[in-house]
Amino acid sequence: MNIVNSKILFLSFTLLLLLQSSIVESDSICLSSGVASTVAMAAPGSVQKGDEEWRAILSPEQFRILRQKGTEYPGTGEYVNFDKEGVYGCVGCNAPLYKSTTKFNAGCGWPAFFEGIPGAITRTTDPDGRRIEINCATCGGHLGHVFKGEGFATPTDERHCVNSVSLKFTPAASSL
């Protein structure tokens, strides 16, 4: 077997293991061992596009973060020190993700929220088990990571560390 075939086999096996071991959960969706519970919002993955379609509607930086799981530099995002009332949605598909009432200042350099809108966020444990990735449940866009037990005085003791580039803010007057 040549080296290219070996790498493809290794990557395929790794992906299979990740799919079998990943747990995706949110407030109104829980996928574990292939069994799904009730979904209150649009079904996960209901907005599906190829890379070329995403590139046509996203800026290069949005594509890098949402579709390639990138991270913006800390302190550079539009919504880090933003405190207006409204809803933060996915910049890729416009699905509502977070209410402004759940945003707090974690001092981490990225917008921080203590919970998402029920059914809007999926969670997947990274392969090394150290972090939990959060994605838009509707289009699968990468948002950032969630951290638990850091001692913040929030109702959930969770910090959703979200890339500003992944978000689109809608003021309260025209939001949900």
From Swiss-Prot:
The active site is at C161 (nucleophile). InterPro entries: Met_Sox_Rdtase_MsrB (IPR028427), Met_Sox_Rdtase_MsrB_dom (IPR002579), Mss4-like_sf (IPR011057). Disruption phenotype: Increased methionine sulfoxide content after cold treatment. Increased sensitivity to oxidative stress induced by cold. Loss of cold acclimation. Pfam families: SelR. Binds 1 zinc ion per subunit. Its cofactor is Zn(2+). Catalyzes the reduction of methionine sulfoxide (MetSO) to methionine in proteins. Plays a protective role against oxidative stress by restoring activity to proteins that have been inactivated by methionine oxidation. Involved in cold tolerance. Eliminates MetSO and reactive oxygen species that accumulate at the ER during cold acclimation. MSRB family specifically reduces the MetSO R-enantiomer. Belongs to the MsrB Met sulfoxide reductase family. This is Peptide methionine sulfoxide reductase B3. It comes from Arabidopsis thaliana (Mouse-ear cress). The gene is MSRB3.
